A protein has these predicted regions:
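Conserved class I S-adenosyl-L-methionine
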Residues: 1-45
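Class I SAM-dependent methyltransferase "Motif I" SAM/SAH-binding loop
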Residues: 51-55
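Class I SAM-dependent methyltransferase SAM/SAH-binding core
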Residues: 58-101
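A short acidic, Gly/Pro-enriched loop at the edge of an enzyme's catalytic core
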Residues: 101-110
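A short SAM/SAH-binding and catalytic strip from SAM-dependent methyltransferases
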Residues: 109-125
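A short glycine-rich, Lys/Arg-flanked "PGG" loop and its adjoining helix->strand segment in the class I
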Residues: 128-140
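SAM-dependent methyltransferase
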Residues: 146-230
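C-terminal lobe and adjacent flexible extensions of AdoMet/dcAdoMet transferase-like proteins
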Residues: 220-274
């Protein structure tokens, strides 16, 4: 099982991501508005949110007039997402599925894999299978958007020496029971597989400051290099239209590879089906 398969994680997912993505290193301000604009621009023949989690993008789109489908590998994530949609009186199609082989039974003009969804595929075989599956689900000229980040050698070098119990504090949030929870993680990096793996530790505290629960949850992600992504896109029937750097409209100049050096934010790929 992975981090996102656990009931306790799914029920608090948006709570701790809201904190994480507002930290300086993980700035994701405006990400929902960003995907709404993409949906307005490219979603005329339907939108699907792949790796939708508990609905941060999917529900935001629906509340702003874009009714999309949603799918996630985690049944727990789908369950929480469906409950949140029902609480908002939103009638959405949400189903469990693996992005490498799910069949939605229809095609779309926009496929969204937001935030780190694509990076949870642990090897190139699954990445290729997923990209080809997204291609099959798109109408001619349809758009796939997904995220990667620039692997950073200094961080990689540090993580290559990380031991399973070398926990570092990540954040603190308030869970769905009103309890303070501190999150620590210990992430190691394997340069031969490009895999980041390790554990997230969740410590829950009572009102007196006593730790009353501790849970360890595993997580595995694969780093994908920028030029590797260009080759994967080409191999799977896509052309790179744009690479946004963050959610404020900044874009790389695709005719000048050195333009990428100006940014430290995530790469948000806009891929067009050939």
């Amino acid at each position: 099982m992975d981090l996102h398969d656990f009931k306790d994680v799914a029920e608090n997912y948006d709570r701790y991501l809201d904190v994480m993505y507002n930290q300086e290193f993980d700035k994701h301000e405006g990400f929902q508005e960003f995907y709404l604009e993409l949906a307005k621009k490219y979603g005329r023949d339907g939108v699907i949110d792949v790796a939708c989690g508990t609905g941060a993008v999917l529900l935001y789109l629906a509340e702003h007039g874009v009714i999309a489908d949603g799918t996630d590998l985690s049944q727990e994530m789908c369950r929480v997402c469906f409950q949140k949609a029902a609480a908002k009186n939103l009638d959405l199609r949400i189903f469990q599925g693996n992005m490498a082989d799910f069949d939605a039974g229809r095609k779309y003009s926009l496929v969204i894999i937001a935030r780190s969804g694509f990076m949870h595929l642990p090897n190139q075989k699954l990445q290729i299978a997923a990209l080809k599956n997204m291609n099959r689900h798109l109408v001619p000229g349809g758009i796939l958007t997904l995220n990667t980040f620039d692997p950073w050698p200094a961080v990689q070098a540090q993580q290559m020496n990380t031991k399973p119990d070398d926990y570092s504090f990540r954040l603190e949030y308030v869970n769905n029971e009103g309890r303070r929870v501190k999150i620590y993680n210990a992430i190691s990096y394997n340069p031969w597989t490009q895999i980041m793996s390790g554990n997230w530790k969740f410590e829950t505290y009572d009102d007196a400051g006593n730790m009353i629960d501790e849970r360890i949850r595993p997580l595995t992600m694969r780093q994908t290099y920028r030029w590797e992504m260009f080759l994967l896109a080409e191999l799977c029937g896509f052309e790179v239209v744009d690479i946004y750097r963050g959610y404020k409209g900044d874009k790389e100049d695709l005719n000048d590879p050195m333009s990428a050096s100006k940014y430290q934010s995530n790469l948000i790929w806009i891929l067009k089906k050939k």
